[in-house]
Amino acid sequence: MAVRSPFVVVMGHVDVGKTLLLDKIRGTSVAYREPGMITQHIGMSFVPWQAVEKYAGPLVDRLKLRGKIWIPGFLFIDTPGHAAFSNLRKRGGSVADLAILVVDITSGLEDQGVESLKLIQSRGVPFVIAANKLDRVYGWKSVENRPFLTAVEDQEWHAIATLEESIGKLVEQLSKLGVEADRYDRVRDFGRQVPIVPTSAVTGEGIADLLLVLAGVSQRFIPRDKLTVRPGPARGVVMEVKEERGLGVVADAILYDGVLKKGDTVVTAGIDGPRVAKVRMLVMPKPLEEMRDPEDRYMAVEEVKAAAGVRIVADGLEGVVAGAPLMAVRDPGEVQEAVKVVGEEISEIKIETDREGVIVRADTFGTLESTVLFLRQQGVPIRKADVGPPTHKDVVEAVLSRRKNPAYGVILAFNVKTPPEVEKEAMSSGVKIIRGEILYRIFDEYIKWSQEVKTKTVEQILSQMTRPGKIQILPGYVFRRSNPAIVGVKVLAGTIKPGVTLVKDGKEVGRVMQIQKSGKPVGEAAAGDEVAVSIQGDVMVGRQIKEGDVLYVYVPDEQARQWLFQYKQYLREDELKALEEFLKAGRRR
């Protein structure tokens, strides 16, 4: 059986040169193609191994790869980034066979790069690191399209020193994330170390090295069985759904197995479950040699064999979501079985596992899956996760979740817009909607918001609790003996406020009515303050209390437990000591 080319996705932080790197790689296949050798794809670029061999030239021999590579070439996904990789999903793993993690060699691994790395690792996809922007290394002498191994031999010592320092920092960053890596020509065990290839998407330096390292990694880590294309109806994944003038709703899909034919029935999925559609037309780009008119770039074909990127024109594609599985069926009796398989697959993504947690919404099945995975890794519980914009039901679910934990009253919306009526309902219900197109920024905003909510919630709870306090009646400062007793006191620890109950030796003596300092009423007195207090109750100075007595603020048992076991960090040291003394006095009684 035929062997297909591995699918390759390019990932990394914003502005690291992902798109430019892809353009440079695509350029090699065009420049070094042979007539009729280049097959055009929808959403993918094919780089044949023969073109790589011609482009890389002596480096192929230097690395002893000539005649050893059995893959036909590489199929690069045209759209770089997190979303494309997320949508390349299938049951049990990823449609992507290889990934290139692009890092800016001058600044190292950044937030989105870390997120991309974790996503790649979660799917178990072999990857190579392209340390890009080599041309910006101080003192580096660039020559167009030169292999890195050749270029590095032509550099001054200060350029090499700067390069080594940058790679060393990157290796250290990766090590802290549990990834052992090194410059690719120093890697001795590719099973243990991730290769780093210095590249320049501007000059093309290191591109040859990158393609050869990709080839080596693919041969080492991708089982031949995974790349073997089996006969029969196609299997694939939907990458994009859009409306095309004159064609209606079309789906751009990647086929990783089998053959898709005009007239086939395809089973895929929308927000509300599996969808069945009949293929009316299959569209592919014309070969490069035949592209005379930019407006006439596509042609209709009768069938498409995996691996391929194809545009499907079919009745019934409305509402299909990117990242959905795609199964072709030719026997009408097998349609229901395919519907069942697709339904089971998408139900694994649409999760409602935690009793309490946040609500998650994403634009595609793939991004939903990766969003949920990322949030789970960060310890964020999820009550509900689904594809599509937030709904009325989501707001209701968030309100219910908030009752258990105010920080769960939120909808995290990745790459989806919120309908105005839902936005209005959420606002009136006190439900927060956090939306964005970059996952780690949504997470950061959620963490910031949840901390604010937690702080506000704790402040509200603490404002209703009695803070511990300890006072001493000052000798010579009895202004009134009873009804109410008015005495001068010094606050020895903690805080006293009007309304608190005072106790002596575990027995209640009365309630503080008013506190005055320098003849004026105040709302509270803290440790060190000397104030006058009026005490209402069955108390008389000279009987129940005397000059020099130490009194404690009465803290109810339940609140005392809360202070000690839930909110201890919110007590000052003197307040904690006063609480412990109060409890000890109560036990003695």
Curated annotation (Swiss-Prot):
GO terms for cellular component: cytoplasm. CDD domains: aeIF5B_II, IF2_aeIF5B_IV, IF2_eIF5B. Residues 78-81 are annotated as: G3. It comes from the Archaea. Residues 12-19 are annotated as: G1. InterPro entries: EFTU-type, P-loop_NTPase, Small_GTP-bd, T_Tr_GTP-bd_dom, TF_aIF-2_arc, TIF_IF2, TIF_IF2_dom3, TIF_IF2_dom3_sf. Keywords: GTP-binding, Initiation factor, Nucleotide-binding, Protein biosynthesis. Residues 3-224 form the tr-type G domain. Pfam families: GTP_EFTU, GTP_EFTU_D4, IF-2. GTP binds at residues 12-19, 78-82, 132-135. Residues 200-202 are annotated as: G5. The keyword Protein biosynthesis applies. Residues 37-41 are annotated as: G2. One of its GO terms (molecular function) is GTPase activity. HAMAP family: IF_2_A (MF_00100_A). Belongs to the TRAFAC class translation factor GTPase superfamily. Classic translation factor GTPase family. IF-2 subfamily. NCBIfam families: aIF-2 (TIGR00491), PRK04004.1 (NF003078), small_GTP (TIGR00231). PANTHER family: EUKARYOTIC TRANSLATION INITIATION FACTOR 5B (PTHR43381:SF4), TRANSLATION INITIATION FACTOR IF-2-RELATED (PTHR43381). Function in general translation initiation by promoting the binding of the formylmethionine-tRNA to ribosomes. Seems to function along with eIF-2. This is Probable translation initiation factor IF-2. It comes from Pyrobaculum neutrophilum (strain DSM 2338 / JCM 9278 / NBRC 100436 / V24Sta). The lineage of its organism: Archaea, Thermoproteota, Thermoprotei, Thermoproteales, Thermoproteaceae. The gene is infB.
